[in-house]
């Protein structure tokens, strides 16, 4: 069998069109959704990510502003800028692009963002709310994956799910959202003794470690759904994921490609989180 492709670009297009309609309705009431993105330093990958986020805002009727600072920016000055944005009624979402220069404590920076504007969902208050099943914001990448499952009618209740990776950005929140949906969840990581023993039992596999070919065809149960969150480069410099796509697609039931899978969904869910923040602010006004 050859797996059915879960097309992140196509789903993103649909969700962004819906978000643009809701944004237009809010704007008509004087509450245009606004996102502020802060970039410190000149990391080329970060510059691309920020550019894509700003463009997504512009294309869908959101207000956006980009604050760019040199790598020498002090932690105190960055925290002061975040405080200003916290108090700015035009801004409903604040995103600080990671990684930050070594002299800036990223944990302190994330905690400085007002929880109600933390559209990445990284603040400890939002992480805690996710743990209790009542999140204000769901982290964008796992949220996007959940939308993919829903769009393709992939059953999660009672399913065996394996998440490979335990980061605060993807692995842990992904496991929490799957658990919330009724799946039986196993988290695997670099210290897991026999990864294949876990993945071969899984109906759902989410690979999110940033290691090429960590999941191969012999590790996948026929018909399983495989979500590839990884972003790596192959020997030719071509973008690839964590999954051996060519092999696994012949075994899996559903699979996401890289590029064109989870990546577009991450920015789409950032828009939706910002939109939901703006809707809450408008309701409270």
Curated annotation (Swiss-Prot):
It catalyses: (6R)-5,10-methylene-5,6,7,8-tetrahydrofolate + NADP(+) = (6R)-5,10-methenyltetrahydrofolate + NADPH; (6R)-5,10-methenyltetrahydrofolate + H2O = (6R)-10-formyltetrahydrofolate + H(+). It comes from Burkholderia multivorans (strain ATCC 17616 / 249). SUPFAM superfamilies: Aminoacid dehydrogenase-like, N-terminal domain, NAD(P)-binding Rossmann-fold domains. The lineage of its organism: Bacteria, Pseudomonadati, Pseudomonadota, Betaproteobacteria, Burkholderiales. GO terms for cellular component: cytosol. Catalyzes the oxidation of 5,10-methylenetetrahydrofolate to 5,10-methenyltetrahydrofolate and then the hydrolysis of 5,10-methenyltetrahydrofolate to 10-formyltetrahydrofolate. It holds the Pfam family THF_DHG_CYH. Belongs to the tetrahydrofolate dehydrogenase/cyclohydrolase family. NADP(+) binds at residues 165-167, 190. The keyword NADP applies. This is Bifunctional protein FolD. Its EC number is 1.5.1.5, 3.5.4.9. Homodimer. Pathway: One-carbon metabolism; tetrahydrofolate interconversion. Gene3D superfamilies: Leucine Dehydrogenase, chain A, domain 1, NAD(P)-binding Rossmann-like Domain. Keywords: Amino-acid biosynthesis, Histidine biosynthesis, Hydrolase, Methionine biosynthesis, Multifunctional enzyme, NADP, One-carbon metabolism, Oxidoreductase, Purine biosynthesis. One of its GO terms (biological process) is methionine biosynthetic process.
